[in-house]
Amino acid sequence: MFEYSLIAGLTASGEDAYLLHVTTTPSVAYIARVDDFDCGIMISASHNPYYDNGIKLIDCYGEKMPEEILLLVEDYIDGKLHVFDKDWPELPFAHREHIGCMVDYVTGRNRYMGYLISLGIYSFKGVKVGLDCANGSSWNIAKSVFDALGADTYVINAQPTV
């Protein structure tokens, strides 16, 4: 629900939304950087306490946005943004010819997996690897990467509820 609400808001404001779906925060950071996106947005719901989850904003360099920016975004969402001696209006909706589009960006996730595989200094050929994905965001990346590095990979807890 959060994913599609965010997509609706972005596209209604004239922006395109590239979806990686369930994935890891490092993959969003990597794709934001290498594919030259203005930013990356990660909706997180992890093993962390609830107050550490929510929306993570990543800049075009693949880094977490500075705290000052995050606070401005939070104030804007709360309707309390007052900067440069003025209140900021709601984001305008795009005109029909400028509505953004949603792109299922599996290519991005695959590129990230290729990057991880390219880092493989060691061969895992003949090595048995057990992965507990904890039903989390790495479930659709981890096995593919270890398999590509030659491991005999066994995975448990790779059924996240999304």
Report residues per predicted region.
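Ferredoxin-reductase
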Residues: 1-61
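Gly/Ser/Thr-enriched, mixed-charge loops and adjacent short helices
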Residues: 53-162
